[in-house]
Amino acid sequence: MAKVTDSKEKTLAAATLLFRRQGFHGTALHDVLAAAGSPRGSLYFHFPGGKEQIGQAALDLAGETVRSKIARAAEASPSAEAFLTGIARAMAADLEQSDFCNGCPIATTALETAAQ
């Protein structure tokens, strides 16, 4: 049963990253499957609603990831200034590590799909 979860998690992680880099509309499902190394059937098994469902799951995952990073930074910061500085540095480091390819994990997809 662990393989099923791994397949779903790999697919979701790949989709989340690709949506950040290419946008929701710029990412095809075959791109997600190739990046995850998953067979086509597994995507529709885990996400029967197709691209819209995996897009929502990617937004949920990105939101939870950002929320937990902010919560950890808040707990570790002795002041509001230290907290804000830490968040800004973490965002800058994420951009630099991705060679400025990763967009905001939430805004990239949310802005493209808001009117739909």
State each model region's role.
Residues 1-6, 77:
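N-terminal intrinsically disordered/low-complexity leader segments
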Residues 7, 31, 98-102:
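A generic short alpha-helical patch detector that favors 3-5-residue windows
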Residues 10, 14-57:
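Helix-turn-helix
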Residues 60-65:
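Short, basic, alpha-helical segments at the C-terminal edge of helix-turn-helix-like DNA-binding modules
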Residues 70-102:
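Hydrophobic alpha-helical connector segments
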Residues 113-116:
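Short, intrinsically disordered, charge-balanced linker/junction segments flanking boundaries
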